[in-house]
Amino acid sequence: MIKVGICDTTFARYDMGGAAIDEIKKHATGIKIIRRTVPGIKDLPVACKKLIEEEGCEMVMALGMPGPEEKDKVCAHEASTGLIQAQLMTNTHILEVFVHEDEEDDPEDLKVLADNRAREHAQNLIMMLFRPERLTRDAGMGMREGKPDVGPL
């Protein structure tokens, strides 16, 4: 059985981890999901690394919702850098799934974006694990997670 890690935060205003888990369960079998929740996005890198090294996860999703302030953007960048370092240290993919609070003005639109992005990245995880040829087929197609695809040039 393949182990997959889901790591999310209490700072987020939407349960993206729950949406990702729901999506994985709908579209894949033979996966054991291990979920960890941390306070904020800067806690994600070590939590994801622990899921890989201590729990044996073959792939991890890191889900977070940085706030709208400049300091939140700095924290998001630091978290992203940490996630990249964790990937390189463990030779394991960590799918970064961030939705910035200022991506949408309306809270309902932000909720829809967070749900869609979490679910579409969960589908990416499934494809990376079980159908990598699908991703190759879609290379250069302008695919977007959470918002409409923009298409190829």
Curated annotation (Swiss-Prot):
GO terms for cellular component: riboflavin synthase complex. The relatively low activity of this enzyme suggested that 6,7-dimethyl-8-ribityllumazine might not be its natural substrate. The keyword Cell membrane does not apply. InterPro entries: LS/RS (IPR002180), LS/RS_sf (IPR036467), Ribfl_synth_arc (IPR006399). This is Riboflavin synthase. The keyword Protein transport does not apply. Its EC number is 2.5.1.9. Gene3D superfamilies: Lumazine/riboflavin synthase (3.40.50.960).
